[in-house]
């Protein structure tokens, strides 16, 4: 990520105040799933302009009753992996760029009410050159990070910027790898914070 120009602070202030007053269900709640179901969202709209199979898929999805994800935990799913590590990705981003990332829900486009988007966060630190920039996070489980977003991710970010009326979006991909046991953790590097290859490491505690 890099900075092209200084952010228009007054414009971003107005937009964020406007968005705070709009209906935006909190992410992963029942209301959020229903809100997304009743429109086309940034994360799925690529199907509408992709292969016939994907076009059929999105039509089929909209013909089915709304699906609310259960509270049960499947620790092997890609969804769980992304949800588990997303807060760590945000913390890394905030630390790396000395910023603060605010959480926002899913909103409707001002004019096209069926078009909806929910970024993983927005830079809200006014004195940061990335103020007002959207953040989209992916934590792949098997795919190798190449530095180039997949087509569906690229479309997702374009729609997010359109719906939120913000001109920039940082795409962050992170991979967190688990050690098999405590011994493997201790043997990888000479400290508790860096691996033998100089990468960051640490302990993640998860509560259910």
What are the functions of these language-model segments?
Residues 95-119, 123-208:
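Nucleic-acid nuclease catalytic cores
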Residues 1-84, 88, 180, 191-194, ...:
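Charged, glycine-rich intrinsically disordered N-terminal tails and low-complexity linkers that flank
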């Amino acid at each position: 990520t890099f900075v092209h120009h200084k952010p228009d602070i007054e414009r971003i202030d107005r937009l964020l105040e406007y968005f705070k007053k709009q209906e935006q269900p909190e992410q992963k709640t029942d209301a959020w799933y229903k809100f997304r179901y009743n429109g086309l969202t940034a994360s799925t709209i690529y199907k509408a302009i992709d292969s016939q199979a994907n076009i059929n898929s999105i039509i089929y999805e909209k013909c089915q009753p709304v699906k609310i994800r259960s509270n049960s935990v499947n620790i092997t799913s890609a969804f769980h992996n992304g949800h588990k590590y997303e807060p760590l990705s945000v913390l890394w981003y905030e630390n790396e760029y000395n910023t603060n990332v605010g959480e926002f829900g899913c909103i409707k486009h001002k004019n096209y009410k069926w078009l909806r988007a929910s970024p993983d966060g927005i830079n809200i630190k006014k004195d940061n050159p990335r103020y007002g920039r959207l953040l989209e996070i992916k934590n792949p489980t098997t795919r190798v990070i190449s530095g180039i977003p997949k087509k569906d991710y690229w479309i997702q970010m374009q729609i997010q910027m359109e719906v939120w009326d913000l001109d920039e979006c940082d795409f962050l991909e992170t991979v967190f790898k688990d050690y098999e046991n405590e011994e493997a953790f201790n043997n990888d590097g000479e400290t508790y914070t860096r691996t033998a290859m100089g990468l960051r490491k640490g302990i993640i505690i998860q509560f259910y």
